[in-house]
């Protein structure tokens, strides 16, 4: 898919090209957990909120199968249409390759138009010299991806104007509290949005969201500050690979939301889950928890026992 946009695509003589469609796989753990006496306590709203489904069932639900097939088909159709346009191969042929051929040796890939040539690595210098109109004995000048990206970053860091557009990256799961390297801390980001709202040199904000969601509370904290920010200046959200659940929640206040054609977004709903280990301790390890409490539900949420019906309704 990525290679197809190139003017020319080459493959090593001992290479292989694979073309086999898309798949999504998950493991369902209901019986495995029961075997060990582990009881998941799950509260879920929304039949398409499927993240907790593997802990509840042994089979995929119809709703989850439907949504998974929908987004896989959407991604696949976009991919083959793009490849078809770039390589001048019909979508029917590309689907046939995925269904019946799957693997292509170099000659086969060239015959059907997936590649343009077959070369060893040492032959590529000569190919590139010819492609760029140079003499075959000239030295090929190249730049590494690292050096090129470093140069671009240096150019982007130039501060040339008193009027600025702020770019904020919100990447990772959404957690309560402060930011860390792999998560979006609700309090930390709310403070960033507050500062941007107050900064008169910032004329607009672009929020790049790449998040599967997380804490509903942290999402609400950020949503509030983003709503206040939008009242003062334009707010644009750019979605990355995914902006699901809380990731969509924090995107909602934007004046405009922009996605890539393959962004996965939605998953609007809530769930809560924790495991209880009372049966594991009693029946497998001969450990017997005992509790003393002042009221019937003083130990609600204990990992030693499941929720009762009243507590489930409360949740």
Predicted regions and their residues:
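Small-residue-centered hinge/linker elements
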Residues: 1-90, 95-96, 103, 129-234, ...
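Short, contiguous alpha-helical
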Residues: 109
């Amino acid at each position: 898919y990525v290679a197809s946009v190139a003017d020319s695509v080459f493959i090593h003589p001992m290479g292989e090209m694979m073309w086999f469609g898309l798949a999504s796989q998950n493991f369902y753990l209901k019986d495995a957990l029961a075997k060990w006496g582990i009881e998941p306590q799950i509260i879920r709203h929304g039949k398409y909120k499927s993240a907790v489904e593997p802990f509840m069932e042994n089979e995929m639900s119809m709703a989850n199968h439907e949504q998974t097939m929908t987004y896989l088909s959407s991604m696949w159709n976009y991919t083959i249409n793009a490849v078809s346009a770039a390589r001048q191969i019909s979508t029917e042929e590309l689907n046939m390759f995925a269904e019946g051929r799957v693997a292509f040796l170099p000659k086969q890939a060239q015959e059907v138009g997936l590649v343009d040539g077959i070369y060893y690595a040492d032959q590529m210098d000569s190919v590139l010299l010819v492609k760029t109109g140079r003499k075959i004995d000239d030295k090929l000048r190249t730049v590494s991806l690292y050096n090129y990206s470093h140069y671009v970053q240096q150019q982007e860091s130039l501060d040339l104007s008193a009027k600025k557009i702020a770019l904020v990256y919100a990447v990772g799961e959404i957690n309560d509290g402060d930011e860390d390297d792999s998560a979006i801390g609700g309090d930390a980001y709310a403070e960033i949005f507050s500062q941007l709202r107050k900064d008169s040199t910032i004329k607009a904000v672009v929020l790049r969201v790449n998040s599967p969601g997380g804490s509903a509370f942290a999402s609400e904290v950020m949503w509030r500050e983003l709503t206040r920010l939008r009242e003062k200046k334009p707010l644009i959200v750019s979605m990355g690979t995914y902006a699901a659940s809380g990731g969509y929640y924090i995107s909602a206040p934007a004046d405009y939301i922009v996605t890539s054609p393959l962004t996965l977004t939605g998953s609007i709903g809530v769930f809560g889950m924790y495991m209880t280990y009372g049966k594991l301790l009693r029946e497998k390890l001969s450990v017997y928890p005992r509790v003393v409490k002042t009221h019937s539900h003083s130990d609600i949420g204990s990992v030693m026992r499941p929720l009762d019906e009243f507590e489930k309704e409360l949740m």
